[in-house]
Amino acid sequence: MAARLCCQLDPARDVLCLRPVGAESRGRPLPGPLGAIPPASPSTVPTDHGAHLSLRGLPVCAFSSAGPCALRFTSARRMETTVNAHRNLPKVLHKRTLGLSVMSTTDLEAYFKDCVFTEWEELGEEMRLKVFVLGGCRHKLVCSPAPCNFFTSA
């Protein structure tokens, strides 16, 4: 079974945060202007924790009981799903948090698994999505093979 993600849109910063379901609702604080987080101690996040889950691309911190690093995406308002290209993904996710049925869980899981994580891992930066990682995770930084310019591309 794939990991279940809780998606939170911060309209003030235009950032979409992805966290596993069950994590603290506020997540971990992200100090600094670029959201950099100091490295975690090895005892805080076991390297094999959650390795059996099938959703590729999530760092080990996503499955930590101590709470995950937020996977933060800039330009979130421009991110669209391939299933419903006319819809804006953050709005769709926000409606789901309000209990409104606008996209099935299967569609959401397929989007994140096949369109985001797989393409970023195998193809590098996917320009079609117009989404860039901001700050990165202290356990895994999703980056294109070319020099990273995520901080200037948003």
From Swiss-Prot:
Cross-referenced InterPro entries, in alphabetical order? Transactivation_prot_X
**GO terms for CC?**
host cell mitochondrion; host cell nucleus
| Region Mitochondrial targeting sequence, annotated ranges | 68-117
Q: Pfam families attached here?
A: X (PF00739)
Task: Give the record's keywords alphabetically.
Answer: Activation of host NF-kappa-B by virus, Activator, Apoptosis, Host cytoplasm, Host G2/M cell cycle arrest by virus, Host mitochondrion, Host nucleus, Host-virus interaction, Modulation of host cell cycle by virus, Transcription, Transcription regulation
**After translation, how is this protein modified?**
A fraction may be phosphorylated in insect cells and HepG2 cells, a human hepatoblastoma cell line. Phosphorylated in vitro by host protein kinase C or mitogen-activated protein kinase. N-acetylated in insect cells.
Give GO terms for biological process. Answer: DNA-templated transcription; symbiont-mediated activation of host NF-kappaB cascade; symbiont-mediated arrest of host cell cycle during G2/M transition; viral genome replication
Where does this protein reside within or beyond the cell?
Host cytoplasm; Host nucleus; Host mitochondrion
How does this protein assemble?
May form homodimer. May interact with host CEBPA, CFLAR, CREB1, DDB1, E4F1, HBXIP, HSPD1/HSP60, NFKBIA, POLR2E and SMAD4. Interacts with host SMC5-SMC6 complex and induces its degradation. Interacts with host TRPC4AP; leading to prevent ubiquitination of TRPC4AP. Interacts with host PLSCR1; this interaction promotes ubiquitination and degradation of HBx and impairs HBx-mediated cell proliferation.
Function recorded in the entry: Multifunctional protein that plays a role in silencing host antiviral defenses and promoting viral transcription. Does not seem to be essential for HBV infection. May be directly involved in development of cirrhosis and liver cancer (hepatocellular carcinoma). Most of cytosolic activities involve modulation of cytosolic calcium. The effect on apoptosis is controversial depending on the cell types in which the studies have been conducted. May induce apoptosis by localizing in mitochondria and causing loss of mitochondrial membrane potential.
Which family is it part of?
Answer: Belongs to the orthohepadnavirus protein X family.
HAMAP family assigned: HBV_X
Q: Under which name does UniProt file this protein?
A: Protein X
